[in-house]
């Protein structure tokens, strides 16, 4: 992903029936690694904007697209969890790709105990090197510790808890934990501090300050904005007004 912008909007418009225009010709480009807080009154189109960026809303005017190859992650107001899995099972979805790398590395190592030609050996060693590099790039050897820290910091329910019995706030914390572990290039957060205690908010702020990707967060939390956002995007009467934060 070598594009200048991670997300681009050109003349973005959205109308809800019968004739409520919430976004009126927005032109914006988002830099990789930027931390952006989205402000606006209720009904200003903040959630709609994030849903368009997340691909949840696909009917709109104008153009909007993410950079080629960019991974986009979205925390909705009412996120979806897999009811067939417990808390840990849902959180583990966030590290599925990392787990797959570790599994593949073990499979490759097992091959070295099998008879093979010199050519086959070269291929196996080359793949081992590629997988090793991918593992090192995401610090996969520490995945269990990383997962434990995130679950503890966000005060998640017990790992074996039935997600269908969780409160709305508990479900949001599980979904947020899963999303952060996925490490998307573009992280879209709709009121991420809702249902978090002060210590969890402080951990989240620190995590997002160091987050390598782009963060776009809707929030009413002024302290969160001060501590995380480099830019503010204010939505007012369908228009978007970006300005530099603290």
List the model feature ranges, each with a label.
Residues 1-246:
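ABC ATP-binding cassette signature C-motif
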């Amino acid at each position: 992903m070598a594009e200048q912008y991670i997300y681009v909007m050109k003349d973005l418009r959205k109308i809800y029936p019968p004739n409520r225009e919430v976004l009126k010709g927005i032109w914006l480009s988002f830099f990789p690694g930027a931390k952006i807080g989205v402000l606006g009154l209720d009904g200003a189109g903040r959630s709609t904007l994030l849903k368009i960026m997340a691909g949840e809303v696909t009917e709109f005017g104008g153009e909007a697209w993410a950079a080629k190859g960019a991974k986009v992650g979205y925390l909705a107001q009412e996120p979806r969890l897999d009811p067939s899995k417990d808390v840990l099972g849902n959180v583990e979805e966030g590290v599925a790709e990392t787990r797959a790398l570790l599994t593949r590395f073990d499979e490759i190592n097992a091959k070295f105990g099998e008879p093979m030609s010199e050519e086959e050996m070269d291929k196996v060693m080359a793949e081992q090197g590629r997988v090793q590099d991918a593992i090192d790039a995401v610090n996969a050897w520490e995945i269990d510790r990383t997962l434990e820290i995130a679950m503890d910091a966000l005060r998640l329910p017990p790992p074996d808890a039935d997600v269908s019995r969780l409160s709305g706030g508990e479900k949001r914390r599980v979904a947020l934990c899963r999303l952060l572990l996925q490490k998307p290039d573009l992280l879209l957060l709709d009121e991420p501090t809702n249902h978090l205690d002060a210590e969890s908010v402080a951990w989240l702020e620190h995590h997002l300050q160091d987050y390598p990707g782009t963060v776009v967060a809707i929030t009413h939390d002024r302290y969160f904005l001060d501590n995380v956002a480099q830019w503010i995007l204010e939505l007012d009467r369908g228009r978007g007004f970006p300005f530099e934060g603290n």
